[in-house]
Amino acid sequence: MSDPAVEVTPAVPVASPAKAKKEKKPKSDKPKKPKAPRTHLPVSDMVVNAVKTLKERGGSSVQAIKKFLVAQYKVDVDKLSPFIKKYLKSAVEKGQLLQTKGKGASGSFKLPAAAKKEKVVKKPKKVAEKKPKKAAAPKPKKAGEKKVKKTIAKKPKAATATKIKKPVAKTTKKPAAAKPAAKKAAPKPKAAPKPKAAKKETKPKKAAAPKAKKPAVEKKPKAAKKPAAKKA
């Protein structure tokens, strides 16, 4: 009897923890250097400002640009010269700057006319944006027009209400006004005897004054009795 064959699996190498630690050590050993804060603007902004302020018809040379940076920003041009050359090349390729003389990073540079036109056009755009905001003030007028429409719509309603009330008032007041008219007509015949009082006033009572004179005339003939003296 032959013994059955036994399968043997190969042993898998296990990474020791010491090796893993060795791999992490170099990462922790490298100290991070603190980045020094910038004391100036980016090179692109400084170069563009230099070309704008110099305003040379034939373009500003690299030397003129460097002198401007030293005077304006007080920068070490020797350290920034490679960055200046890189920006000039990329700016010419992108169309941000025009190279009037030389090739590559040497020669003269100026701003393209399209960039100047865009800057000039941007200013009126800002003014045009502000004007519609001021012109938007007439919006309250629309609200006023709505108010006028509402008031006009309400006026006919009030007119119809008054028209309905007027005939009702006329029908009720007419019989009431007729009653006092009859009452006033009754006292008119009572006023007729008033002329009688006027006739009494016209009687000339004072004209009867001559009656007082009659007794004076009657007394005079009584004095004629004097002839009685003849008897003596």
Swiss-Prot record:
InterPro entries: H1/H5, Histone_H1/H5_H15, WH-like_DNA-bd_sf, WH_DNA-bd_sf. Residues 39-113 form the H15 domain. Keywords: Chromosome, DNA-binding, Nucleus. Residues 1-42, 98-232 are annotated as: Disordered. One of its GO terms (cellular component) is nucleosome. Residues 1-18 have a biased composition (Low complexity). GO terms for biological process: nucleosome assembly. Pfam families: Linker_histone (PF00538). It is found in: Nucleus; Chromosome. Its main location: nucleus. Histones H1 are necessary for the condensation of nucleosome chains into higher-order structures. This is Histone H1A.
